[in-house]
Amino acid sequence: NLPAISAANLTSIPAGNLTGTVADARISTLSASKLSGSLPALDGSALTGVGVGTADSINTSGIITATAIVSDFQPRNMIINGAMQINARANGTLTINSSTGQYPCDRWVSRGESSSKQFTIQKTSIASSGRGVRNSLKVTSSQAASVGSNDIYNVRQKIEGFNIQRLNLGEAGCASMALSFTVRSSVAGTHSGAIQNESQNRSYPFTYTLVANTWKDVKIIIPPITSGSFNEGTGVGLRVVFDMGSGNAFRGTANQWNSAQNEGATGAVRILETNGATWEISKVQLEEGTVCTPFEKRMVTQETILCERYYQRYGAQRQMWMTNVNGTDHRKMVYFPTTMRVSPTMNMYDQSVDGSSVSAQGVSPNGYYCRLNGNGRHAAWKHEATAEL
């Protein structure tokens, strides 16, 4: 009789000398190098640890259960005109040299300090960036400024309170936010910005690092905040701020909510400290959740309507014969194409009247009536309606 033979002592046995089947329980830790030939169909339920790359695709005929929902709100992007397409004011290059905000394009406003520390800003067109960017806002420093501790220099957008209700900011159950944008600068290093509430007593400074003159897609996740007051009506819900070089008094610790007015992060670079330095941005998106999704592309008509809630300019001269109320008082109703946020401030310009002058009366978010106070019955004019935050 032969003694028991251990399979561990058998080597170099030709496959043709092996017959029968091997129980599944006898197979373990089988390396991929030991497999060859055609494999039988595999049940996917038995596979674990199988990764899928971003270039791969999966076909399914069943139901997919997602582990997280990015957002159930449409549109996702709370930023309006994030691709810098709409410029109803038709502003060209603006010189920013005071705290009075100026609009290089719709919904975006910039402020600064004195003329000795000024910079310019403009909406620009880009032939090719390789990142789907066709328009941007471009800041250019006019000198190497000596920034004071209390100076504020920024580019920002104010988001209406109604549009942030989905976030439940300042409450238990507050949602995270995902901020993304495409940016480049001639100044390499760590740049910064901030998210602020209306009262500017809650701020979240953020940072992003750039290589000089190279476009970068930036993604930032902003954690929930369960304290502070956040407007959820027609006022300012949030400010999204990009810092151009504010002073130390308006900078704070990055990547946390601070109970202060922070325009940027402590230690970040300042565009204004370098003469001729440039900074450009486009594709700005702020959405609910912990995932930065691809930039939400809107039809230009949709984007225009969203912008018109805050600013409208009727650049073609209106020609109207007035309805005769009495001998010296003539009125004509004018309706806005889009209901505005609040009753706007009206500017009636390029007037050509038969009689005295025209004025906007009975102004509401829906329109106004044009009044010709005089003996004439014909008037021509253009109007500008402003209901910015």
List the model feature ranges, each with a label.
Residues 68-389:
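Extracellular and organelle-lumenal recognition/adhesion modules and their flexible linkers in secreted
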Residues 1-76, 287-295:
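Intrinsic low-complexity, repeat-rich intrinsically disordered segments enriched
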